[in-house]
A protein has these predicted regions:
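PLP-dependent enzyme catalytic core of the Aspartate aminotransferase-like
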Residues: 109, 116, 132-187
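Active-site C-terminal subdomain of aminotransferase-like
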Residues: 1-100, 104-133, 137
Length: 187
C-alpha cells in the first residue's frame, strides 16, 4: 500500500523498545534499509497515499455491496458489510474498511475461468497497488497446503481475493459481472 505501484516492498516496525532492539540486531545482519532508489520511490509515492487509500476503500465497498447480491457469488468477506461478523469492531477501529475483500464463487463457476475472463482486474501474486487485482489462494499463497489444511484456514476451492484499485467502480463491476457470466456459459 505504501508504494501503490507494486514496485517496492517496504514498511516500518512499530513496537516496544525490546522488540525494536531485536529487529535492529537482525537488520544489522540481514540488511534492513531500502536502496536509495527504493527509498526515492517510496518518498514519491507516499505523497498520494491518502487519496489512493480513500479510493481503494470506496471501490472495495462498492464491489462488496454489488457482489453481496450477485447470484453467482456465494459469499462476500468484507468488514464494511453489516452482515460481516467483524463489522462493529471494524467500524470502531477504522476510518475505512480497506481495499481488500474476498469472495466465494458460486460452485458453477471455475475460478481459473473467472480469472482468465477478467479484462481490467488482473490476476497476480501481489495485491494492494493502484490497479485492481485478483488472487486465487488455492494456486498461490496456499498452494503448498493440503485440502484439509486449507479448509481449516477457511480457504475454499472457490475463494478469490480481490484488491480494489482506483479505476472506475462502474468498470470494475462490469468486468466482474461479465467474467462471471462468461465463466458460467463456458461450463
Amino acid at each position: 500500500y505504501l508504494g501503490g505501484h507494486s514496485d517496492i516492498s517496504a514498511g516500518a516496525v512499530i513496537s516496544s523498545k525490546v522488540r525494536i532492539d531485536r529487529v535492529y540486531e537482525l537488520a544489522k545482519s540481514l540488511g534492513g534499509t531500502l536502496s536509495e532508489f527504493s527509498a526515492w520511490l517510496l518518498e514519491r509515492s507516499i505523497k498520494t497515499l491518502p487519496i489512493r487509500v480513500w479510493q481503494q476503500n470506496e471501490n472495495a465497498m462498492g464491489l462488496a455491496n454489488f457482489l453481496n447480491s450477485h447470484s453467482l457469488i456465494s459469499k462476500v468477506y468484507y468488514p464494511g458489510l453489516i452482515s460481516h461478523e467483524g463489522h462493529e469492531i471494524a467500524k470502531r477501529q477504522m476510518k475505512g474498511f480497506g481495499g481488500m475483500l474476498s469472495i466465494e464463487l458460486h460452485p458453477s463457476i471455475k475460478p481459473e475461468l473467472f480469472l482468465k475472463n477478467l479484462k481490467i482486474i488482473k490476476p497476480v501474486m501481489s495485491l494492494a497497488g493502484i490497479e485492481s487485482t485478483a488472487n486465487y489462494p488455492k494456486l498461490t499463497s496456499h498452494y503448498s497446503l493440503t485440502d484439509k489444511e486449507r479448509s481449516l484456514q477457511a480457504i475454499s476451492d472457490q475463494l478469490i481475493r480481490l484488491s480494489a484499485g482506483i479505476e472506475s467502480i462502474i468498470d470494475l463491476k462490469n468486468d466482474i459481472d461479465n467474467s462471471l457470466k462468461w465463466s458460467e456459459n463456458e461450463n
